[in-house]
């Protein structure tokens, strides 16, 4: 039996605020969403240092070693979407839209849109 795909309501490019952890209160833009792990990588938040070794690939130029600072993933439960100056929860609404077929005829369809729970507006 196929396993159900995990859903994450935060999308790449969203501005989020960290609500728990060592970077609580920090805001940043989502760089990457790791859906299977239910984690997000936020720009400038949860930065960690990685010590890397010089890798030489048989005479060719390899990677340089040293200490690299990069963002580490944060669980989605520890971030909230920033919208309209404050944080908000995310909801979903089904909107009815009219679509057009290649032959010119139209038909009704539904699409799912993200909404702000605080204002009710589409995100």
Swiss-Prot record:
Instruction: Spell out the molecular function terms from Gene Ontology.
Output: rRNA binding; structural constituent of ribosome
Q: Name one GO cellular component term.
A: ribosome
The alphabetical list of record keywords is: Ribonucleoprotein, Ribosomal protein, RNA-binding, rRNA-binding
Q: Name one GO biological process term.
A: translation
A Pfam entry, by short name: KOW
Which InterPro entries does the UniProt record give?
KOW (IPR005824), Rib_uL2_dom2 (IPR014722), Ribosomal_uL24 (IPR003256), Ribosomal_uL24_CS (IPR005825), Ribosomal_uL24_KOW (IPR041988), Translation_prot_SH3-like_sf (IPR008991)
Among its keywords, does the record have Lipoprotein?
no
Question: Transcription: present as a keyword of the record?
Answer: no
Please list where the region (Disordered) is annotated: 100-123
Give the protein's biological function.
One of two assembly initiator proteins, it binds directly to the 5'-end of the 23S rRNA, where it nucleates assembly of the 50S subunit.
Q: Which HAMAP family match?
A: Ribosomal_uL24_B
Assembly mode: Part of the 50S ribosomal subunit.
* UniProt record similarity statement: Belongs to the universal ribosomal protein uL24 family.
User: What name appears for this protein in its UniProt entry?
Assistant: Large ribosomal subunit protein uL24
Q: Which organism is it from?
A: Nocardioides sp. (strain ATCC BAA-499 / JS614)
């Amino acid at each position: 039996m196929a396993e159900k795909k995990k859903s994450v309501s935060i999308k790449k490019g969203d501005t989020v605020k960290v609500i728990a952890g060592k970077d609580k209160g920090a805001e940043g833009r989502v760089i990457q969403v790791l859906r299977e792990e239910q984690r997000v990588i936020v720009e400038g938040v949860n930065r960690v240092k990685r010590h890397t070794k010089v890798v030489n690939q048989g005479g060719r130029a390899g990677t340089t070693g040293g200490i690299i600072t990069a963002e580490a993933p944060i669980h989605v439960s520890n971030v909230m979407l920033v919208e309209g100056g404050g944080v908000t929860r995310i909801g979903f609404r089904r909107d009815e839209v009219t679509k057009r077929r290649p032959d010119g005829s139209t038909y009704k369809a539904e699409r799912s849109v993200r909404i702000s729970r605080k204002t009710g507006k589409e995100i």
